[in-house]
Every structure is written in C-alpha cells, then in structure tokens.
Amino acid sequence: MTAPILIRPATRDDAAAMAAIEVAAAQRFREIGMTHIAEAEPTDTAAVLVRIDGGRAYVAVDAHGACVGFAFYRLLDAQRLYLEELDVAPSHAGQRIGARLIEQVMARAAQDGIAEVVLSTFREAPWNAPYYARLGFEVLDDAMLDDMLRTIRAYHVSLGLDETQRVFMRLRVSG
C-alpha cells in the first residue's frame, strides 16, 4: 500500500524541493535520447517564487511532509488555464500523483469558471502526451492554435525546444 499523499498550495519553503524534483524527473529523458532536456537547469528560483507567491503552484507531499511532486499553472485568458509544468519524483512514480495534481488544477479551474486547461508537451515521450491522453486531454491541431498558444510555442523555440516534437493538448473542465 502506498503512503497517503496530500495535495496543497506550494509555499516558499517548497521551492528547493521542487527544483530537486524537476531535475530528477528530467532524467527520464535520457531513456529516449533527449539528454539536452535531462541536462537543462531547473526553473529559475525567482520564477518559482513568483508562481508560489501568485498562488499558481501546487505540491504533493508525503506523510512525512516531503515534497514529491508539483504543478505550475497560469491563467491564459478568461477561459483557459495553462499547465506550465508537472513533475513527480521518480521515487514516487506510478502512484497517480501527477493525476492528482492535475485534478487539483482542474478543480481550481472549475472554481474560477474556467472552461479548459491546456498544456504543451512532448508528443512521443510515454510520460508526456500519451499520459495526458489517458487522463482525457485531446491534441490541438496546429490550425486550432490561437495567438496566445503560438506565442508560447515561440517562447519554447527561444529556449531551444524542438516544437516539431511537441503538441498542445486540452482538457475541458466539467462542473
């Protein structure tokens, strides 16, 4: 039996653990030849703190209070939240922690009257687009991308990401 996991808003005290989780989770990309992702620096601490201070981050903590996963999100417009990042410590993979973090983001979206949650992810990595599809996310064709999503894509390109390997996805918020 797995230990209970609590999902809660992130605090500044979680920032260092979130960075460690981001680095550890990125190591999976070595398995599929994407070493540049595995070797990338974690999100800048100042940017993490902005998300935390703005109430745009959730963490998953174990029974001992240790952070084992996190999600960053932001409001895109009146109808959409953007799931910026989702990471789970490899030591806690397979326990539905990522799904629970997404459920929390979806609940927040529903509470705020948001119609959908969108994200951008790698198309082929098994723990990326295929995982999100299992959770109900659907792929957005390039023709469906508006200026906001194209701006996100351009930002990713500026970071050195190959957007031909990525896809935008969405999940409509119920209730």
Outline where the language-model segments fall.
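Acetyl-CoA-dependent GNAT
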Residues: 9-15, 19-90, 102-104, 108, ...
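Extreme N-terminal starter segment of soluble prokaryotic enzymes
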Residues: 4-6
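Short, well-ordered coil/turn elements that cap or connect secondary structure elements
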Residues: 2, 52-53, 134
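Conserved beta-strand-loop-alpha-helix junction that forms the acyl-donor binding cleft
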Residues: 119-128, 145-150
